[in-house]
Amino acid sequence: MSALAGLGLLTLITQVEIAGHTRVLVLDDCPAGLDGFYAPARNSIGLCRNNHSDDAGLKVTLLHEAMHRLQHCRQPELADQLNADHSVNELEEEAAEMQHWGEQDLSAAASWLQRQLKEKCGDQPN
């Protein structure tokens, strides 16, 4: 990992933490196949570094998980509805679209998401 790539990831993490009033943890001990997660009860995003080969993958995973944070800010009761398959599928579809956008144009996707997080999560506690 180059210093520049690492700096880009750290910058994006900081932007998501500030705009989304959340915490981002970079983990090295996730189970195989888990790229990242959003834990609404802990208001934190986990990025599984051990399951990514580069920072580019971590960045788009961060966008995906930050979209789940945004979804939670838009509808705080979502955490209670996560047992409904249709709700989970809709949430994952929206997050996957954000991830795909990030793969195509990381800067534009990150800027849009940062603005949305500021607007929708601004009054949320950390």
Question: Where are the predicted features?
Answer:
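Sequence contexts marking disulfide-bonded cysteines in secreted/extracellular proteins
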Residues: 29-31, 47-49, 96, 120-124
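Short active-site segment of divalent metal-dependent hydrolases/proteases
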Residues: 63-71
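Glycine-rich short-loop/terminal segments
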Residues: 1-40
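Short pre-active-site segment immediately N-terminal to the catalytic Zn-binding motif
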Residues: 45-62
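Solvent-exposed loop/turn segments at secondary-structure junctions
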Residues: 51-53, 68, 76
